[in-house]
C-alpha cells in the first residue's frame, strides 16, 4: 500500500470513529476523532461536514460555520454544507 492510500485509510478510519461517537452522542469524542481525520486529509468533505454538525449540535454555531465554509470552498457543488449554511442564514 502506498503512502497516499495509507493516509486516506487513516482519515477514513478516524471519520468512521467520529461518526460512531456522534451516533451515541459522545460529541467531545467525535470532535477529537474528526479533527484527527482532517489532520490526515484536510479535503475529507464528509468529516468536515460532520464536524460542523457536531459543533452545531453543541451550540457552537460559529465553529460549525467555519467548517462548512471550508467544505463549501473545497467542493462548491453537490455539497450538503451549502444547505446547512443557508439554514443558518435563514434563521438569522
Which residues fall in each region the model found?
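Register position in tetratricopeptide repeats
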Residues: 23, 57, 87-91
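Helix-start (N-cap) detector for alpha-helical repeat units in TPR-like alpha-solenoids
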Residues: 4, 11-12, 45-46, 79-80
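Conserved structural position within tetratricopeptide repeats
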Residues: 5, 35-39, 70-73
